[in-house]
Amino acid sequence: MELREKILERIKVTSSGCWEWQGATNNKGYGQVWCSNTGKVVYCHRVMSNAPKGSTVLHSCDNPLCCNPEHLSIGTPKENSTDMVNKGRSHKGYKLSDEDVMAIMESSESNVSLARTYGVSQQTICDIRKGRRHGRLRR
């Protein structure tokens, strides 16, 4: 059986038109399937988009389970990152406002407490306080 057929047998079409993979996923939620030809696990969305090796596949629907070729496009890592930022899916640390950063720099609270308050890592708080992030802002 061809790999694409194997994938199509295990999808569920949603009301938004996504073809959601119903099998195994990785820790980021992307569908995975065993390819007997190569002896490797491959990403379903890459197979369905006919992505060349080394390329980046973008999901217009932002659904990592989606295998619908109409929701997939080939792009660059930079385009994928820009898409993530524009859609608010980037690392939470990038969502801090300038006011948040200034409050972090001026706070006497612990890194642990501030990380919980702002929903970022302790390392992000540490980096802000040491000027390694948001260096354009000064106390």
Curated annotation (Swiss-Prot):
Disulfide bonds: none annotated. It comes from the Viruses. InterPro entries: His-Me_finger_sf, HNH_nuc, Homing_endonuclease_His-Me. Coiled coil: none annotated. Signal peptide: none annotated. GO terms for molecular function: endonuclease activity. This is Protein 2.8. It comes from Escherichia phage T7.
